[in-house]
Structures are given as structure tokens and as C-alpha cells.
Amino acid sequence: MRRSFGIRVAACRFRQDNRGFYIDRAANTISDALTSIKHIGRRTAQKLFEWRERQYKTFSDLLADMEFDPAFDSQAVDILIRLGYFQEFGSAGKLLKVHAAFHEGEIRFSKAHIPATQQKRLTALRAFERSLEESGVPLAEQIRFEVEYAGAPLTVCERERDLYAVLDVDERYSPKLRLYSVSTGRTGVMKVKKPLFRTQPLKGGDMLRILDWQRRPAYQYIDGKPCPRPGVSELWLEAYEKI
């Protein structure tokens, strides 16, 4: 079944040139431009490209630089964290806590502070960041976020071999589902019989676990009669569980 899926769409990453499409031929992946993500503009994408060679010991240090640059706002940084853009600094769950502490609470950092206060707060933020354990976001929540803001799922989790996200549904004739494989990151099409689809309707953004499937010959109609297409097959869902 995996062979029926094609090239994988990967998430953008800090230090890549994501001003446009980024192709990794070795990994057989392609990343969309940062500007395709909701609330991420060209100025932000350009600035991140310019900063690609900068070295940061902690994520807090990067946030401090962002605080002084008008290309960044809290919402854009939050979205990029959730999409794994800054994964070199840690997991999304951990970085979200650092980001929250940076803007709220007793050790928040602001360009309005005097330099001595900024240095004191940054030292405290670095210590706070180092004290945190890695923590992720629930898988289903993460994928739904990716669909909403990036337009498609990006997360890959190899152990979830039967888990798929529904990208869109064509309900003409036997419904066709365009699916994203969470285990491989690839997309493909599966068909489902109408009676089964009516009992368990699906729409774009839903997630399902495939319980059974079959490969069957593809048919075409000639003079009003179904005829098999030589050498062509289709994947059919036989049983699934909506999550």
C-alpha cells in the first residue's frame, strides 16, 4: 500500500531557504514557502533566511533577537513553533512554554526594559528553558493544526502505520478519499463503497484508522458496460474507524 503514495511534503525548518519551495532530493521531500502558512509574511520569511547562519545556544536567545525586530510578532512565532520550524532547539511543547514565559510572568523579556533588566531576564529564561523536559503536542491536535495553518499535514510518526488524515473527499460515484499517511508522510487516493461511507461519513480534516482494505482491478465503462483496465488497480477501504 505504501508504494501507492508519492513524494512527501515536509515541514519548513529554520536555516533552510524557505522564501520559496525547498526541495530535498536526497530525502524525496518538498517544503512549501513560509508565506503559504497563515499569518507568515514575506518580511518574516526574508528575515529568517538572513538569520540562517546565526548561532544560538538557546531558543531564548533567538527570541531575544526577535523581540527587537519588527519582522516578528508573537502570533507568527507561536505558529512556527507549533509547526516544528524551530525543532533544533527542542520539542514544540517545550518551546511553547519558553515562548509563553518570554512574554508573560515574572521573567518576561521586553525591548522596553533597560539593558540590565534585559540581561537579568534573559539569564533567567535560559535557566528556565534548560530546566524543561521535552514534551510534544497530541498527535491528532498537531495534524489538525497543520491542516488549518499549513494547508496540509506535515507530521510523520512511523509507528502509526494505520493512521490517516483525510485531505479531501470526492463524493461523485463511489467516494474517493485523498489521504495522508501519518506513518510515511505520503498522500494517495482510496475509494469506499457508498453504503459504508453513509454509515461513517468523512470530510477533509477528519482522521481515521484503517482496519481493512483491498486492492481491486480498476474498471472503465465501454458502451455502457464495465470493463477492467489492464494492469490498473485501485485501493478500496473495507473498514475504518473515525477518530
Identify the residue ranges that each predicted region occupies.
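Short, charged beta-turn/beta-strand-edge "cap" motif at the junction between a beta-strand
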Residues: L211-Y219
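Short nucleic-acid-contacting surface segments enriched for D/E, G, S/T with interspersed K/R
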Residues: P195-L211
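Sliding clamp-binding short linear motifs
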Residues: M1-F5, A10-R13, N18-L177, R186-R198, ...
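Active-site cofactor/co-catalyst pockets and adjacent glycine-rich loops in catalytic enzymes
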Residues: Y180
